[in-house]
Amino acid sequence: MYKTQMEAAKKGILTKEMKSIAESESIDEKVLMERVASGEITIPANKKHSSLLAKGVGTGLSTKINVNLGISKDCPNVDKELEKVKVAIDMKVDAIMDLSSFGKTEEFRKKLITMSTAMVGTVPVYDAIGFYDKELKDIKAEEFLDVVRKHAEDGVDFVTIHAGLNREAVNLFKRNERITNIVSRGGSLMYAWMELNNAENPFYENFDKLLDICEEYDMTISLGDALRPGCLNDATDACQIKELITLGELTKRAWERNVQIIIEGPGHMAIDEIEANVKLEKKLCHNAPFYVLGPLVTDIAPGYDHITSAIGGAIAAAAGVDFLCYVTPAEHLRLPDLDDMKEGIIASRIAAHAADISKKVPKAIDWDNRMAKYRTDIDWEGMFTEAIDEEKARRYRKESTPENEDTCTMCGKMCSMRTMKKMMSGEDVNILK
């Protein structure tokens, strides 16, 4: 009847995933279906991911957030990463990407997919070296596609594919001076493979074969930005824009096959360039959902890049970005631990929510209004319940207990909420007693 969510939408078929998303997002079912059909909304939902609670990404929907997990050679503890998965899901993330970069990753990936109600993404090129136990240069073009198929068979909902880094883009990169060259891990690997083999990008050259795989499993392609800027100086340069144009062309080819697309974006970028970059992506990539890493608005804050990212993410999402990849305090320094992950998730969720208010996403402001009412009433239990990080709010209150229950240790009886509550109800205001 239909192979993909996009094909169903084009045929006027309301899938169970669409129905669920329309209800949870308070969006009209017909409007949602039209946007899935046009590609403005993507529903990453591999047919084999049975535990998935599908989410939509795109125009008119709440801003989604992704968490990156996975093992590395220096930190190969699978159990620690699986513990992160549990906590991330409890913290209401929308997507989890397995960015494992060491050894045989299949076991972790399969456990992740089984456990995760959130959509799961991967970067198959990371897996190729361990999968084949070969050096990068020795992997054949068709073998990269075979790894993509394996991930699809496992139930991965979306895959990052750096198909826009073709020979033209590589030649342009060589002619343009950058401070940080190529900072995308997958992009740098693909660049190295192309140079070492004097060959075209296998994903660009065999894009139709890639579409065959993704159509069969309804696996979304997240078109990676290999040439994204790795510092403020490199943002919005010719390399970045050239690749974005190519991603727009590949998007149209994918949509012709009813394969869903997400476009990945920067990166590192000054605040005053963010809105223009969002408009460029939406124009050049035909309003496909935009997924950004940050963007980080300054390069000088290692240890605090969850903050630099949240600033950029809020601005970007308010301007039209649909999907934020979280950044943790460990960015540029180490593999994040559990506490780093928690801080990154909270920072990203705050950015997404702030943007949703700006975008007038249905019911977004209601959360803030509930909190405001509880503050006016000095209802501590209500405030804790509505807090984005309830555990931290309760802990801070407990660690610094005031003399009077209707105050905190900042203002005491000079609390404005306490004063106005008493005045509005006709009570006396006593400060000294």
Swiss-Prot record:
This is Phosphomethylpyrimidine synthase. [4Fe-4S] cluster binds at C408, C411, C415. The gene is thiC. GO terms for cellular component: cytosol. Belongs to the ThiC family. It catalyses: 5-amino-1-(5-phospho-beta-D-ribosyl)imidazole + S-adenosyl-L-methionine = 4-amino-2-methyl-5-(phosphooxymethyl)pyrimidine + CO + 5'-deoxyadenosine + formate + L-methionine + 3 H(+). It is an enzyme of class 4 (lyase). Keywords: 4Fe-4S, Iron, Iron-sulfur, Lyase, Metal-binding, S-adenosyl-L-methionine, Thiamine biosynthesis, Zinc. Catalyzes the synthesis of the hydroxymethylpyrimidine phosphate (HMP-P) moiety of thiamine from aminoimidazole ribotide (AIR) in a radical S-adenosyl-L-methionine (SAM)-dependent reaction. Pathway: Cofactor biosynthesis; thiamine diphosphate biosynthesis. Substrate binds at N68, M97, Y126, H162, S184, R185, G186, D225, A226, L227, R228, E264, Y291. HAMAP family: ThiC. Binds 1 [4Fe-4S] cluster per subunit. The cluster is coordinated with 3 cysteines and an exchangeable S-adenosyl-L-methionine.
